[in-house]
């Protein structure tokens, strides 16, 4: 049985291969997850790690969930999400479809990554439980792409009825404005993990939601 969607976390700490392979990552993740608690989620996002390594790392983070109630969401890898029993999976345009995931994992919460109001509508109609919409501001991972800022979030929120999580270059000082425009919450990667005190950085995001 799926968790009630009103319990969807509002601050999403997104990882990467590079972040998860840093020395002391699990210790830092524990601190971040403790701060966020059930208002937060850690996204386990990997393109390079082999399956056994990703599986072991996900299980380690899931143990931290038991202590902190911070959600664990696996990006793309439905097999890892199912094998570990995480709280959700985040699908991209390269992933299998939302209906396909529902057919094999009916209890799994499903997020969809979108880049337009139209994609958000399609994701909701397909049965996704939320969308991560971006990018809002220019980021090092998407150099040269035009920043969409708050008008983009307005358009996405107006197009759907499920929760919208904004992503892309979002700093703590942006959060309140984005939430006031109807977003359920925000996702951040470098803004949390590249800070010397990731625990404090996460708390800054949470305090603005």
Where are these regions (language model features)?
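Short, glycine/charged-rich "phosphate-handling" switch motifs in NTP-dependent
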Residues: 184
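Short, glycine/charged-rich beta-strand-loop motifs at protein surfaces that mediate ligand recognition
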Residues: 140-144
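Conserved N-terminal beta1-alpha1 strand-loop-helix module at the mouth
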Residues: 1-129, 145-148, 155, 161-162, ...
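C-terminal binding/interaction regions
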Residues: 181
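A short, flexible beta-alpha/helix-coil linker loop
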Residues: 18, 137-139
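Short hydrophobic "strand-cap" motifs at the C-terminus of beta-strands
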Residues: 167, 189
């Amino acid at each position: 049985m799926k968790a009630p969607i009103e319990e969807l976390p509002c601050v999403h700490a997104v990882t990467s291969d590079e972040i998860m392979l840093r020395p002391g990552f699990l210790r830092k993740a524990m601190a971040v997850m403790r701060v966020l608690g059930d208002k937060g989620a850690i996204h386990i996002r990997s393109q390079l790690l082999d399956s056994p390594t990703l599986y072991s790392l996900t299980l380690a983070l899931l143990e931290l969930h038991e202590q902190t109630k911070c959600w664990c969401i696996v990006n793309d890898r439905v097999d890892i999400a199912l094998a570990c029993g995480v709280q959700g999976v985040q699908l991209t345009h390269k992933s299998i479809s939302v209906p396909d995931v529902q057919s094999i994992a009916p209890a799994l919460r499903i997020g969809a990554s979108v880049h337009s109001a139209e994609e958000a509508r399609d994701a909701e109609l397909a049965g996704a439980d939320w969308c991560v919409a971006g990018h809002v501001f220019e980021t090092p991972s998407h150099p040269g792409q035009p920043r969409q800022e708050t008008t983009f979030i307005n358009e996405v929120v107006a197009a759907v009825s499920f929760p919208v999580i904004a992503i892309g270059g979002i700093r703590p000082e942006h959060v309140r404005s984005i939430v006031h425009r109807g977003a359920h919450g925000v996702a951040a990667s470098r803004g949390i993990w590249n800070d010397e005190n990731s625990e404090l950085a996460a708390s800054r995001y949470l305090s603005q939601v």
